[in-house]
């Protein structure tokens, strides 16, 4: 018994490990793994089907084919365990050793490992500093390489062709050594002195200045150092021994019909062995050189194919013309080891079936078909049957279950009670795609799902399928109940709003129930309470919509949290009073005293959750659903064709539009408008007509006229079914109703351009053939787009998860004072997102002061919940500095304070929460709702007319920021600064509106002045950019020579003449170096200085500038000297939707990025080249000026002599995030990415909390480049993990040494994922070969910090419930204790074992 125990214990030992190291294997190491050399290419004997000796499946090397039985059958059974049979040489043991025992092949000639040769950059090439082409020519026996030059004039590593080699042999004899093939490369690698080489390179690095050379040297130094530090030897990149995979990992399976299916690896190994044996024989026979050489080359090719088929030359194909799957293919790609078997596994105890509605279920239940339950809970049933003594053995229990005896069903009921199951719907885009429910047994074969969780699963009942999984262990059940139960997931992790919200029928029912109707039956009654209201409705004495007075008792929480009753008479309707009966105590009646649409219901649930907490909300949600379904049925709302009322005015609106179009067509034919203008105008006309039709239609549907009690006519909101569905938010929208009853409108071609003839018909009238044909265009594109979108969105999610997967909350507070300023999002005249929405659930980074005072309103480190936000609003605070994950100081992970509230739970986040994955899911999940298209500007699609003025909407005072201005002759302010912002401040000091004011705008109101709503405060000419003078005086022309630098033009219509400055390309040779300018002088002809500087007022004019002044005229400050025509920038495409989000997270540079000032200083222009201008910025403090070449066609925003600040825009365009980071810092780039991503999502009406985007930005910023190494051991220009630099600097500063200086890097998410510290995580993401090659050469250690690495090695993840386990292990390791292994004595164990063997599977009662 005891040795059986020992034996069992030996079988189940698990390795405790903290890190995984990858390195090159030395030949000795490979031999030490091996259990014998494979010498023959044979696999199994075709007659006996036994493995051949010394073959690829040899039992002597790899172990027995049957458990505890040798091959010849001499020794069988357990008692001979460990004996080696003398007849067939097979050890008697378990078969499963055939999965772990390796063999080896001794190669007759060394071969290069293709990964280190061909995986770019070639490691062998870098190490030897030879080009890859040369190395390949040596390896594949085309040329010789000199290994030892000796006393000759041949250099080491010199490449010799056949002829050169023979010549050298004649000349020098055996003075020198040159070889070909892998032996040559191996000899070269062996004779390298890595440390000396390293020294030499470092010296070179210090001497050289050229950038390319430095780069190359740093690369080599890094590689050499990696070899030195990791203890890898370079010659190990050449294989002399080839390991052979255990046979059960490359199986050979007999098919029926006597054929065999085999793994491709066997073919590849067979090739290697055949060629190797042939080469050995040739060497023994001392065959001619050329034959041996050919055989060696073939061996090299065979080994290449085995390791990575198709990497070099054509892939070796099998019998069916398909390339063979090599070792490298086994691990990479979606079907490879990582993604198929390690990151995703099939699980047992699971089933799947179609889903149907379970409208009678409670929120925490799901209906499980009895058949499925019986199958899924089998082990529990067997155990219970035995425990009850209803079955003596497991076999008997099995029989009972198979016969489905009556008692089995009772047992099943018991087993299932309070045993949660998990329901999952693919695709699982966020964590709410798997939730736990308590099963309720049902007849039939479909799973029943609670309607309210459909939104979270994105499920509908048109044939969707769902999978059921059973959590087996007690811990798993506990986790499922405490964390994954549907009742615990009421709020969405993406935005903190309820995700359990009624939709469709329920909304319609509640809306119908809470509508009011003029002169309904029972109007004007006074009722004693909701009970009476219900009685009257049920007996038919009052209509659901009757306006009545009802006595209502509300309960409100007082300061102590006690409920206080308050009764009053309310004007309401019968339906609302009935609905009040299900509303939990503590909510105000006003919440139901309105027509409830979808938004109102969602708000109602949210309020309930915030005031009363989880349990009442769940009960309330269920009640809402039951009530909604009941009254939707009562309403009898149905759609008939007469509900689609076509407006009478439709016909005349369309004929008016047609007349306008005809007129424009005439203008076009007479040449007054261009084809483009005509197209745009036609589209505008039709878009306007469409809007008018749909407005007329909605007005028509919206109201109906009824007779009230006094016999007068009165308008009321209509009870039209279609209108009710759209108005309540149950189904449909105004746009869809427009297609049913208005006109379908303009259609787009697949390329996105708009067809100029609209579809004037609607679906009620029906479409004619042409209209139908035009419609198919758009419909088909929609379908193609959807398919594309799903794949793209899935890939984006995968990249996001990969970059953020190792980010976990690891401490409570990192103590930083850093943070980001939060202000409301204001675009033009409307607040897109108020401040409270942005700061809710964040932690303040500094004390928030009461505006205008020094009183602290909210102290530092406060989690801002709803009540705090109300306080901020009351005191009209419009900017709050909050903590952010981007500025968090925690080394690995982030702290709870920088993250703030856990959106799905409503309290501050717990330690161990995997915020990275949550962020990735929250951003990726709505990806499928985003559009795929790029918007072309033009047509009605998205035409913003060039703005030429600012008109405010609200009254208040004006506040200008970063403004320079002058006062012109009429006393108005003229703006002379570039990025001026105009804000409208209301009487409480809150920013209501915000506008950008361009250079040259004339302001009607000054800074701080009051304006009324609707007033125009600024205007400008959108088509030209003026040059404004800042001083008064007389104009003097400099270098303005007619015919050389300027030309005169006279306008035909007005007869005014103007001067146009010629572009440098149009000038004569003499005019090339002239710089046309306007100088301002005083009456005596002396220069006038620009106020505040010592520079004369001189304005250089760029090409194409138009001057309408004559030399010597008097001007005053604020006047326009010249105008520069602007090309209309309206033809660029705006990338929108999903591609835009991907571009932002990949940190791609836009095509023509904005040019930003690298330093602060004064702008001037240097010598021009053919196509470029030289921009020079001279700093004021006299340090070195900065020069940049800018293409001539770029429009510059700055004039010569103007002062710019670092990071100012010099030339317009989309800004590149890298530039923002470099010039304006981390916070600016965070703000930029967050705002840009939010813009895309906001357009689609998707709410995502900013935190999630910040989390991804933090991960994009996790690398830094060393600028100056200081006393640290980093290399200059090396890219290192930001946290590593921080830790190193902290240690250096503690020792009083100089830390390293660095600049933060912004990496795109793909790059960032591949650059992670963990090679396992990177390899399982993309480019597996490259990642593993790099890691092996450097001998990398994977500390297993992230989630992915731990999943792959099969451990609990260091997040969630696994966080405690990992913390515990770290504590123990720090204390130097042994890992807690279960200590069992043999006696205890044998007793319990005996019990087990006798009892079978006896579970206990508390299952």
From Swiss-Prot:
Protein name: DNA-directed RNA polymerase subunit beta'
Lineage: Bacteria, Pseudomonadati, Pseudomonadota, Gammaproteobacteria, Enterobacterales
Gene: rpoC
Keywords on record: Acetylation, DNA-directed RNA polymerase, Magnesium, Metal-binding, Nucleotidyltransferase, Transcription, Transferase, Zinc
Presence of keyword Acetylation: yes
Annotated catalysed reactions: RNA(n) + a ribonucleoside 5'-triphosphate = RNA(n+1) + diphosphate
Family from the record: Belongs to the RNA polymerase beta' chain family.
HAMAP family the UniProt entry points to: RNApol_bact_RpoC
GO molecular function ontology, one term from the record: magnesium ion binding
Matching Pfam families: RNA_pol_Rpb1_1, RNA_pol_Rpb1_2, RNA_pol_Rpb1_3, RNA_pol_Rpb1_4, RNA_pol_Rpb1_5
Its biological purpose: DNA-dependent RNA polymerase catalyzes the transcription of DNA into RNA using the four ribonucleoside triphosphates as substrates.
Keyword Electron transport: no
InterPro entries given in the database record: DNA-dir_RpoC_beta_prime, DNA-dir_RpoC_beta_prime_bact, RNA_pol_asu, RNA_pol_N, RNA_pol_Rpb1_1, RNA_pol_Rpb1_3, RNA_pol_Rpb1_3_sf, RNA_pol_Rpb1_4
Enzyme class: transferase
């Amino acid at each position: 018994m005891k040795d059986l125990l020992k034996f069992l214990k030996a079988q189940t030992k698990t390795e405790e490990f903290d890190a995984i190291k990858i390195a090159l294997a030395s030949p000795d190491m490979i031999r030490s793994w091996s259990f014998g050399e494979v010498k023959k290419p044979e696999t199994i004997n075709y007659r006996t089907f036994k493995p051949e000796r010394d073959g690829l499946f040899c039992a002597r090397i790899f172990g027995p084919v049957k458990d505890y039985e040798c091959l010849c059958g001499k020794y069988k059974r357990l008692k001979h365990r460990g004996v080696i049979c003398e007849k067939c040489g097979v050890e008697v043991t378990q078969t499963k050793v055939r999965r772990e025992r390796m063999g080896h092949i001794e190669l007759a000639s060394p071969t290069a490992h293709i990964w280190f040769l061909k995986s770019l950059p070639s490691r062998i090439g870098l190490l030897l500093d030879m080009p890859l082409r040369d190395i390949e020519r040596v390896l594949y026996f085309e040329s010789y390489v000199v290994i030892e030059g000796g006393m000759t004039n041949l250099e080491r590593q010199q490449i010799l062709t056949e002829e050169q080699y023979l010549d050298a042999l004649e000349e020098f004899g055996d003075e020198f050594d040159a070889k070909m093939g892998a032996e040559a490369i191996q000899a070269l690698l062996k004779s390298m002195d890595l440390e000396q080489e390293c020294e030499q390179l470092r010296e070179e690095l210090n001497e050289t200045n050229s950038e390319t050379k430095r780069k190359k040297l740093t690369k080599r130094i890094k590689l050499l150092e990696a070899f030195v530090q990791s203890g890898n030897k370079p010659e190990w990149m050449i294989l002399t021994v080839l390991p052979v995979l255990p046979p059960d990992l490359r199986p050979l399976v007999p098919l029926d019909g006597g054929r065999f299916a085999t793994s491709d690896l066997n073919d590849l190994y067979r090739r290697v062995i055949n060629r190797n044996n042939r080469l050995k024989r040739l060497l023994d026979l001392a065959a001619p050189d050329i034959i041996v050489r050919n055989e060696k080359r073939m061996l090299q090719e065979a080994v290449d194919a085995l390791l990575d088929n198709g990497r070099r030359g054509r892939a070796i194909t099998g019998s069916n013309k398909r390339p063979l799957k090599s070792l490298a293919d086994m691990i990479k790609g979606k079907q490879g080891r990582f993604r198929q078997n390690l990151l995703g596994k099939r699980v047992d105890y699971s089933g799947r079936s179609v889903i149907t509605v379970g409208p009678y279920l409670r929120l925490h239940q799901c209906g499980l078909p009895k058949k499925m339950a019986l199958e899924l809970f089998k082990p529990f049933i067997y155990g219970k049957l035995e425990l009850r003594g209803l079955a003596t053995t497991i076999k008997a229990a099995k029989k009972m279950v198979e016969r489905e005896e009556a008692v089995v069903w009772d047992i099943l009921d018991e087993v299932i009670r309070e045993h949660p199951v998990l329901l999952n719907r693919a695709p699982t885009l966020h964590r709410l795609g798997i939730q736990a429910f308590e099963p309720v047994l049902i007849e039939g074969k479909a799973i029943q799902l609670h309607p309210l969780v459909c939104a979270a699963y994105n499920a509908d009942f048109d044939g969707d399928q769902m999978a059921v999984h059973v959590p087996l262990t007690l811990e798993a059940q506990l986790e499922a109940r405490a964390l994954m139960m549907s009742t615990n997931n009421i709020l969405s992790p993406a935005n903190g709003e309820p995700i359990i919200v009624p939709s469709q029928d329920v909304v319609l029912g509640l809306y119908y129930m809470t509508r009011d109707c003029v002169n309904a039956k029972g109007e004007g009654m006074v009722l004693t309470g909701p009970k009476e209201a219900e009685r009257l409705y049920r007996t038919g004495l009052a209509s659901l919509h009757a306006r009545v007075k009802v006595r209502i008792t509300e309960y409100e929480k007082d300061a102590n949290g006690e409920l206080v009753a308050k009764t009053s008479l309310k004007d309401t309707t019968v339906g609302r009073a009935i609905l009040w009966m299900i509303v939990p105590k503590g909510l105000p009646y006003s919440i139901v005293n309105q027509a409830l649409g979808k938004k109102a219901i969602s708000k109602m649930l949210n309020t309930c959750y915030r005031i009363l907490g989880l349990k009442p909300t769940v009960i309330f949600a269920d009640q809402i659903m039951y009530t909604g379904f009941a009254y939707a049925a009562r309403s009898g709302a149905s759609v008939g064709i007469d509900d689609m009322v076509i407006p009478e005015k439709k016909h005349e609106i369309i004929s008016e539009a047609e007349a306008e179009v005809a007129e424009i067509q005439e203008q076009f034919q007479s040449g007054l408008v261009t084809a483009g203008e005509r197209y745009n105008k036609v589209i505008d006309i039709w878009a306007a007509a469409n809007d008018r039709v749909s407005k007329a239609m909605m007005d028509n549907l919206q109201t109906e006229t009824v007779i009230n009690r006094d016999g007068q006519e009165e308008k009321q909101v209509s009870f039209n079914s279609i209108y009710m569905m759209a108005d309540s938010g149950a189904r449909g929208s105004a746009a869809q109703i427009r297609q049913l009853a208005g006109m379908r409108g303009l259609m787009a071609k697949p390329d996105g351009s708009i067809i100029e003839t609209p579809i004037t018909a609607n679906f009620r009238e029906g479409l004619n053939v042409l209209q139908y044909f035009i419609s198919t265009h758009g419909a088909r594109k929609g379908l193609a787009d959807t398919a594309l979108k799903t794949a793209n969105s899935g890939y984006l999610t995968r990249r996001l998860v990969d970059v953020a997967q190792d980010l976990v909350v690891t401490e409570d507070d990192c103590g930083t004072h850093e943070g980001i300023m939060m202000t409301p999002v204001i675009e033009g005249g409307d607040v897109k997102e108020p401040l409270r929405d942005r700061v809710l659930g964040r932690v303040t980074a500094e004390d928030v002061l009461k505006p205008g005072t020094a009183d602290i309103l909210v102290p530092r480190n406060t989690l801002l919940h709803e009540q705090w936000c109300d306080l901020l609003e009351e005191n009209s605070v419009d900017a709050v500095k909050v903590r952010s994950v981007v500025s968090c100081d925690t080394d690995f992970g982030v702290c709870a304070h920088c993250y703030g509230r856990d959106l799905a739970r409503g309290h501050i986040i717990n330690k161990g929460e995997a915020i990275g994955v949550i962020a990735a899911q929250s951003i990726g999940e709505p990806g499928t709702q985003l559009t795929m298209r790029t918007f072309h500007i033009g047509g009605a699609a998205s035409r913003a007319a060039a703005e030429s003025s600012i008109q405010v909407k609200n009254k208040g005072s004006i506040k200008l920021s970063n403004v320079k201005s002058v006062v012109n002759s009429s006393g108005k302010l003229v703006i002379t600064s570039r990025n001026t912002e105009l804000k409208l401040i209301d009487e409480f000091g809150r920013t209501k509106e915000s506008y950008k004011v361009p250079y040259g705008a004339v302001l009607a109101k000054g800074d701080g002045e009051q304006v009324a709503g609707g007033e125009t405060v600024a205007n400008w000419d959108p088509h030209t950019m003026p040059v404004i003078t800042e001083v008064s005086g007389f104009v003097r022309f400099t270098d303005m020579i007619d015919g050389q630098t300027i030309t005169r033009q006279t306008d035909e219509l007005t007869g005014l003449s103007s001067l146009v400055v010629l572009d440098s390309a149009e000038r004569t040779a003499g005019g090339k170096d002239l710089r046309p300018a306007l100088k301002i002088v005083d009456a005596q002809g002396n220069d006038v200085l620009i106020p505040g500087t010592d520079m004369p007022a001189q304005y250089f004019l760029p090409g194409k500038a138009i001057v309408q002044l004559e030399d010597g005229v008097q001007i005053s400050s604020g006047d326009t000297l010249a105008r520069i025509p602007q090309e209309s920038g309206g033809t660029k495409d705006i990338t929108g939707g999903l591609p835009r989000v991907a571009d932002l997270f990949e940190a791609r540079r836009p095509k023509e990025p904005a040019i930003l000032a690298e330093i602060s200083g004064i702008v001037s222009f240097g010598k021009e080249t053919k196509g470029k201008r030289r921009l020079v910025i001279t700093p004021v403090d006299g340090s070195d000026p900065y020069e940049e070449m800018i293409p001539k066609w770029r429009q510059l925003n700055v004039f010569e002599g103007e002062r710019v600040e670092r990071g100012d825009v010099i030339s317009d365009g989309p800004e590149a995030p890298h530039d923002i980071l470099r010039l304006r810092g981390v916070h600016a780039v965070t703000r930029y990415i967050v705002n840009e991503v939010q813009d895309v999502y906001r357009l689609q009406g998707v709410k995502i909390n900013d935190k999630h985007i910040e989390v991804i930005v933090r991960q994009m910023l996790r690398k830094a480049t060393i600028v100056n190494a200081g006393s640290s051991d980093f290399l200059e220009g090396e890219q290192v993990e930001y946290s590593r630099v921080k830790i190193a600097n902290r240690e250096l500063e503690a020792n009083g040494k100089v830390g390293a200086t660095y600049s933060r890097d912004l990496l795109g998410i793909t790059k960032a994922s591949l650059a992670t510290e963990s090679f396992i995580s990177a390899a399982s993401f993309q480019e597996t070969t490259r990642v593993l090659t790099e890691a092996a050469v450097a001998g990398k250690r994977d500390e297993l910090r992230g989630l992915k690495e731990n999943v792959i090695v099969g451990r609990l993840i260091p997040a969630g419930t696994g966080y405690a386990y990992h913390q515990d292990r770290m504590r123990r390791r720090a204390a130097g204790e042994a890992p807690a292994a279960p200590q069992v004595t043999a006696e205890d164990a044998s007793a319990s074992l005996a019990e087990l063997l006798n009892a079978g599977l006896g579970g206990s009662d508390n299952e």
